[in-house]
Amino acid sequence: MKILAKWLALAVLLCTMPAKAALDIVITEGVDAARPIAVMPFQWQGAGAPPQAIADVVMSDLIRSGTFKPLDELGLPQRGIGALAQFDASAWANVGAEAVVVGSVKPYGTDQFLVSFDLIDLVKAQNQALKGPTSATEFLMDSRQTVISAAQFRQYGHRISDIVYEKLTGIRGAFLTRISYVVVNHSQKAAYSLMIADYDGYNEQMLLRSPEPLMSPSWSPDGRRLAYVSFENKKAEIFVQDLYTQVRTKVSSFPGINGAPTFSPDGKSLAVTLSKDGQPEIYVIDIATKAAKRITNHYSIDTEPSWYPDGKSLLFTSERGGRPQLYRVDLNSGKVTRETFEGEWNLGGSITPDGRSMIFVNRTNGKFNIARMDLSTRFMQVLTSTRLDESPSVAPNGTMVIYGTTYQGKQVLAAVSTDGRFKARLPVGQGEVKSPSWSPFL
């Protein structure tokens, strides 16, 4: 307990770090196949310089989505444009992009700024230009203005990205989400830190620091709480922490393994792995009462539970077939069905939010990679070519996966699109990073 009192840094809960990216995203593959789009620098209508370049945030978001490729602004016409009223369709006749984002920023009181932006359908504008004069409003896909503070520039940039992404793809954007992960730095006495950051690595916050291992963070469906495993008391225990009130509750401290917590879709329960009755089995714990209900009962190891979106079944890893494979258990009937058969091992699975695909770690020829299986066709696609991949977590819109891997001998985070085309690494400056978890929509 003396070690805990000295090193467990609960006092630094949600202590915001400097405004820089803790995880520097390095894109490694997929930009050339992305859809071209134009994002113009937002017109500044004030003295000096704006607090931040919102267009840079939007461009970075769209690149990281793996879906879009912003064009170099130096090759674009009307570089001073700030609104639809200034748009000249004929000037854009030969620009090979499907849309253009334009906007403006102007002071609007003390530490207040009015941000306006328009999303223009460039393909429609080019087609209409061939037919003769027409109203520019016919090209307008979205137009908004909002008053924000200087501290909100980056967040509002993510909001614009969400709008643009959804308008052009029909899929909700996930740029205003967060990720949690564990940083391990053995040069420090409290080597383990549970961190939270924006999806792109900015606005990093420390939730907990400990000299003992921290692992398996999992978000609640409302994004208010985080469940995780801590060894701070020299044994595995599961905690749930409210990110706003800082209230921290010990949910499971049974003898043996207490691991792999994951919130139910209604946020009232945790699916966990416990070994209190012998072999590791799957249980569901009521968070309010802490009552644990046993779900599986087999002499082999059952672990890594995750919920189906309807909350009626669990996906889990089991060795009951001789090697680790993924199984589904119906919570009402208790019926267990094997889900994976390809490759040597399949483990660490989760179902995408739309319920159509399964994301998991596949081992084939001794290599561990992230894979996706279509649940209707049962077709499996290996998404990554990195080494020793683990702990995949799916974005709430189902388009991207963040996972742990090894690069140059260090544990780092990486991301891949669920179609496998876009890939990126997210290295951290100090230490190693593992156990990522993507938040729900916030």
From Swiss-Prot:
Sorted UniProt keywords: Cell cycle, Cell division, Periplasm, Signal
Q: Where is this protein localized, as stated in its record? A: Periplasm
Q: Which Pfam families match?
A: PD40, TolB_N
User: What is the annotated signal peptide range for this record?
Assistant: 1-21
Cell division as UniProt keyword: yes
In terms of domain of life, where is this protein from? Bacteria
Q: Does the keyword Ribonucleoprotein apply?
A: no
List this protein's GO terms for biological process.
cell division; protein import
GO CC annotation? periplasmic space
- Matching HAMAP family: TolB
Q: Which family does it belong to?
A: Belongs to the TolB family.
Q: How does it assemble?
A: The Tol-Pal system is composed of five core proteins: the inner membrane proteins TolA, TolQ and TolR, the periplasmic protein TolB and the outer membrane protein Pal. They form a network linking the inner and outer membranes and the peptidoglycan layer.
The protein's job, in short, is: Part of the Tol-Pal system, which plays a role in outer membrane invagination during cell division and is important for maintaining outer membrane integrity.
Extract the PANTHER family matched here.
PROTEIN TOLB, PROTEIN TOLB HOMOLOG
Query: What name has this protein been given in UniProt?
Result: Tol-Pal system protein TolB
Per the UniProt record, the lineage of the source organism begins with:
Bacteria, Pseudomonadati, Pseudomonadota, Gammaproteobacteria, Alteromonadales
